[in-house]
Amino acid sequence: ARGFNIESLTVAPTDNPRVSRMTIVCPGDDKILDQVRKQLAKLIDVHEVRDFSVEDRDIVDRELILCKIKVDPRQRSEIAEIANIFRAHIADVSPESLIVEATGSEGKIKALLSLLAPYNLLEVARGGRVAMARSLTPTPAAAPQTLSPVA
């Protein structure tokens, strides 16, 4: 089957204005992930497909989350303390709610959500994961372009 589920998709520009970098997270066994790699490689404008789950387990990956919480004045300091433990911060304050912003690994985000769950979570927005290998070799299409002075 050609169908597969995309758990997370993040797209952003690179230093090269003609190239964007995509991070796609797909759950599945080796057969499913092989199908994902093959389907992506067939796309005309794809420069390179890197599978961090196979090629390079030594990666740094992060996710962004925003949590809107309905609070009364007594709860503000409790939520601020929880945010501080996770090195998150209060991104917005209104008379009846707070928005907590955090970045981190999937495990850190899950742990933060579990501590915020007892509060009145109004809305949760999660950004897709981004990942980068720790090696010194950059992904060719995403590497910064060398600029030459114009004479």
Q: Predicted regions span which residues?
A:
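Long, contiguous binding/interaction regions
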Residues: 1-21, 25-151
